[in-house]
Amino acid sequence: AKTTAPSVYPLAPVCGDTTGSSVTLGCLVKGYFPEPVTLTWNSGSLSSGVHTFPAVLQSDLYTLSSSVTVTSSTWPSQSITCNVAHPASSTKVDKKIEPRGPTIKPCPPCKCPAPNLLGGPSVFIFPPKIKDVLMISLSPIVTCVVVDVSEDDPDVQISWFVNNVEVHTAQTQTHREDYNSTLRVVSALPIQHQDWMSGKEFKCKVNNKDLPAPIERTISKPKGSVRAPQVYVLPPPEEEMTKKQVTLTCMVTDFMPEDIYVEWTNNGKTELNYKNTEPVLDSDGSYFMYSKLRVEKKNWVERNSYSCSVVHEGLHNHHTTKSFSRTPGK
């Protein structure tokens, strides 16, 4: 897919009900490629009450949405702006959230539910974790999440389809969101590894009384080139050896697509004290990333064996491990 700039839509409440103590505003960023975009409210000065959902890929383009809940005394009397930046297309867009209609007045008999952005539930679909897809011993899951479900109409029907054939193996749970007294419904569909890798399409269809028509969301593995990563492990720099803790680095370069999983082990046991960067797009269209592991210097000096494990679809058996330990005398 080619680089595509996003369209940005400000979302104001369906009706101007300011009788409640709070109001929810939204911002929809649609039709962009590739990731990422950054979205802030009032250039980052407004961060409380913000709920930004992960980007969803559909028809080779991404869509992302964010909502912010503020007091009725804040908006519309004060300006609230959604700021969107898409580095890949050098796009920067600022959209001010304007009231619908010339004035903000209560609009009886219409009742505008305060927690419901756009007057009803929203639906998002998420891919399986890459490690679950590529490791045959694990179980990949596609997830459909329905948010802003009213407690007055909690009954949500979710149907699943694989290549338009209905399946009935999903498990669905409902959770209450304390921050705005709505319900969140999560439906998890276990899938076959090969179904995802071969590009089959997964669709969830959601119905609820608050929806004028069922909402459908689809997802599949993005098409594109595959290139195996190069993995390099780097010992702590000499300047760091005066400290109690030292840093081991795993550099992973030249891979496509960006979906990758990296973890550390010490003598075969999983390490927890590591941090990974997000994959970064390189100038040739491939991706690179870093992972750093903080360890006690004495463990490194005692020549413990540390390993950086990488899971990616371009690798033989989808997995590789690079191990190293301190060389005696250093």
Swiss-Prot record:
SUPFAM superfamilies the UniProt entry points to: Immunoglobulin
Molecular-function annotations in GO: immunoglobulin receptor binding
Identification of the protein by name: Ig gamma-2A chain C region, A allele
InterPro entries given in the database record: Ig-like_dom, Ig-like_dom_sf, Ig-like_fold, Ig/MHC_CS, Ig_C1-set, Immune_Resp_Modulators
Glycosylation sites: 180
Pfam families referenced in this protein's UniProt entry, alphabetically: C1-set
Domain (Ig-like): residue spans on this chain: 6-98, 121-220, 229-325
Origin species: Mus musculus
Keywords annotated in UniProt: Disulfide bond, Glycoprotein, Immunoglobulin domain, Repeat
Gene behind this protein: Ighg
Annotated S-S bridges: 27-82, 144-204, 250-308
